[in-house]
């Protein structure tokens, strides 16, 4: 059976390739079929892959490949030993530990001294912030106290000037001297009463602006009037004395002989009184 596919002539391909090679070897520049693509000029002395940047990149890539090959060889060696010489649970633990050891890397991890220095620096910053806040609060309190002190200093002179103004002259209270009444009797069986004092029963005290003379020269026999708030319970029994004598008779014969009370009240001399103002 004959194939339905046409046979590709091989001779033509060889001839075309040879012709193309012959054209290039002759130095003839073929026109570019894609004018948008930039082609480097062919220079035997300055090739694009021989530039220093490309050479450095290839050197770094070669070193990385060597390191990767070494790590993979060591990892395969560790995996083989763990899988063949340990049990399954412990082998899985060591396998995960080895994977973590090989895969996780912290090149920028700080040391212990650097970490402690970082923590102390952070604490110093926080302390500085707290001190700044306390200083601001103290400054505000100081300003408020200064303002309050200035207000009080302004109010004090006004109070002093108002207190220094004379309102009225000094007032003195007049104390009325009590009157002493003596009832003297001649006979022993008659009604006799001791001296009693009667003061002014007016509860309203008078206030005078006239300065009064000194009362230090009053006789010592006079004593102060009893209290106005209640009765005088220290009075002698005047009313019941003589009612019940030896003969149980009421003796009223001596009432006619009662003398008038003698007023020992000293009369103030008008000449000693200061002039009226």
Swiss-Prot record:
Please state the protein's primary subcellular location.
nucleus
Quote the subcellular location field of this record. Nucleus; Cytoplasm, Cytoskeleton, Spindle; Chromosome, Centromere, Kinetochore
Start-end of Low complexity biased regions = 185-198
S-S pairs: none
Q: Which GO terms describe its biological process?
A: attachment of spindle microtubules to kinetochore; cell division; filamentous growth; mitotic sister chromatid biorientation; mitotic spindle organization; protein transport along microtubule to mitotic spindle pole body
User: How does inactivating the gene affect the organism?
Assistant: Kinetochore declustering. Short mitotic spindle and an apparent absence of interpolar and cytoplasmic microtubules. Cell cycle arrest in mitosis with unseparated DNA. Inviable.
**Where do Polar residues bias regions lie?**
156-166, 173-184, 199-235
Q: How does it assemble?
A: Component of the DASH complex consisting of ASK1, DAD1, DAD2, DAD3, DAD4, DAM1, DUO1, HSK3, SPC19 and SPC34, with a stoichiometry of one copy of each subunit per complex. Multiple DASH complexes oligomerize to form a ring that encircles spindle microtubules and organizes the rod-like NDC80 complexes of the outer kinetochore. DASH complex oligomerization strengthens microtubule attachments. Within the complex, DAM1 and DUO1 may form the microtubule connections. On cytoplasmic microtubules, DASH complexes appear to form patches instead of rings.
* Keyword Nucleotide-binding appears in the UniProt entry: no
Q: Which family does it belong to?
A: Belongs to the DASH complex DAM1 family.
A GO cellular component annotated for this chain's UniProt record is:
mitotic spindle polar microtubule
Q: Gene encoding this polypeptide?
A: DAM1
InterPro entries assigned: DASH_Dam1
Region Disordered: what ranges?
1-36, 147-242
Q: Which residues form a coiled coil?
A: 119-156
Role noted for this protein: Component of the DASH complex that connects microtubules with kinetochores and couples microtubule depolymerisation to chromosome movement; it is involved in retrieving kinetochores to the spindle poles before their re-orientation on the spindle in early mitosis and allows microtubule depolymerization to pull chromosomes apart and resist detachment during anaphase.
- Keywords on record: Cell cycle, Cell division, Centromere, Chromosome, Chromosome partition, Coiled coil, Cytoplasm, Cytoskeleton, Kinetochore, Microtubule, Mitosis, Nucleus
Protein name as it appears in the record: DASH complex subunit DAM1
Source organism: Candida albicans (strain SC5314 / ATCC MYA-2876)
């Amino acid at each position: 059976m004959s194939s339905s596919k046409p046979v590709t002539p091989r001779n033509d391909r060889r001839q075309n390739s040879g012709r193309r090679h012959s054209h290039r070897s002759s130095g003839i520049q073929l026109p570019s079929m894609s004018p948008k693509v930039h082609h480097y000029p062919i220079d035997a002395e300055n090739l694009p892959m021989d530039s220093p940047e490309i050479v450095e990149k290839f050197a770094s890539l070669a070193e990385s490949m060597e390191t990767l090959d070494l790590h993979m060889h060591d990892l395969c060696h560790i995996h083989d030993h763990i899988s063949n010489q340990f049990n399954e649970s412990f082998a899985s633990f060591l396998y995960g530990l080895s994977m973590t050891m090989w895969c996780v890397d912290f090149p920028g991890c700080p040391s212990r001294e650097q970490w402690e220095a970082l923590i102390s620096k952070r604490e110093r910053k926080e302390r500085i912030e707290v001190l700044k806040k306390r200083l601001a609060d103290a400054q505000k309190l100081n300003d408020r106290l200064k303002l309050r002190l200035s207000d009080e200093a302004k109010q004090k002179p006004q109070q002093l000037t108002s207190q220094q103004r004379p309102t009225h002259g000094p007032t003195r209270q007049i104390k009325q001297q009590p009157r002493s009444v003596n009832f003297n009797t001649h006979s022993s069986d008659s009604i006799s009463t001791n001296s009693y004092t009667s003061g002014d029963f007016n509860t309203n005290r008078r206030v005078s602006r006239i300065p009064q003379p000194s009362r230090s020269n009053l006789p010592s026999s006079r004593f102060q009037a009893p209290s106005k708030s209640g009765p005088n319970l220290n009075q002698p029994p005047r009313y019941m004395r003589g009612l019940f004598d030896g003969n149980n008779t009421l003796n009223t014969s001596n009432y006619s002989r009662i003398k008038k009370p003698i007023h020992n009240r000293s009369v103030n001399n008008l000449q000693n009184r200061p002039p009226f103002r």
